[in-house]
Each structure stands twice: as structure tokens, then as C-alpha cells.
Amino acid sequence: FRRVLFRSVDFRLGEIENLPVADSIADVIISNCVINLSPEKARVFQESFRVLKPGGRLAISDVVATAELPVKLKNDMALYTGCMAGASSITDIEAMLKDAGFDKIEIKPKDESKEFVRNWAPASKIEDYVVSATIEAIKPKA
């Protein structure tokens, strides 16, 4: 493993509902299949808004719900830890982002991910309820 130092990059360990950084410090927040695991998604987006500089960008790749998940699937711990059962609907994510203060919100479901999702849990039919998506939002400039 080769260690490379970047002056403009900072990695910190913390909880996504309570980020260990100052207000308005980050230019970009990147998240890959993590937010669906949080039971406090609205808080995650509020924290993201807090730490981004005005004009800062939120860039997320995550699983979103395209239909209401049956209770059996929602309560399946393997599907939850597999980043599927905790997925929120596109409408709910958009509302949480708006409530946090973001604008220029774009949520793009990737229908081509259904085959990949199907392979995660073939017998569950989870692909009928979730899909991978890119989620982008901007913290408005003051």
C-alpha cells in the first residue's frame, strides 16, 4: 500500500448523523451506498448541508426505493445490511434534501442496475422495489 498525501483532502472517522467537522468547511461530500443504512436520513442531509460551503456539492450513489417495500423485505436484516431494505423513496429523499436547504436536486435512477440488484438476493424479488441511483444537490450560495 502506497501512501499518497494530498493537502486538500481530509479523511475523518465519524457518524454520518453527526459529522466531526466545522460548519461550511467542505467543497464536496461524496457518499457511496451508506445513507440507506442510516435510520436518521433527514439528519444526514441536515449535517451535509451544515458542513458544505455555500455552493458546495453533495454527490451520492445509493439505493432508492421505486415502490413500497413489503414488511417482510424491510425487516430482512441481510437485505438491510446489503443496502437494500433501508432504501427511501425518491420522493422522500427529494423532500429531505429540500427540507435541509439544498437546491438543484437531481435524482437519477439507474434502471440498468436492476439485474445487479437481482443478483444480490435472487429469491427475494427485491429488484421490483429498489434500484441504484445517483443523487446530486447543491448548497445555495448566500
Q: How would you describe each model-predicted region?
A:
Residues 65-84:
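Short, glycine-/aromatic-enriched active-site segment of Class I SAM-dependent methyltransferases
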Residues 96-142:
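C-terminal lobe and adjacent flexible extensions of AdoMet/dcAdoMet transferase-like proteins
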Residues 6-18:
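Conserved SAM-binding strand-loop segment of SAM-dependent methyltransferases
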Residues 17-28:
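A short acidic, Gly/Pro-enriched loop at the edge of an enzyme's catalytic core
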Residues 1-5, 137:
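Short, small-residue-biased leader/transition segments that mark boundaries at the very start
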Residues 42-57:
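A short glycine-rich, Lys/Arg-flanked "PGG" loop and its adjoining helix->strand segment in the class I
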Residues 27-40:
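A short SAM/SAH-binding and catalytic strip from SAM-dependent methyltransferases
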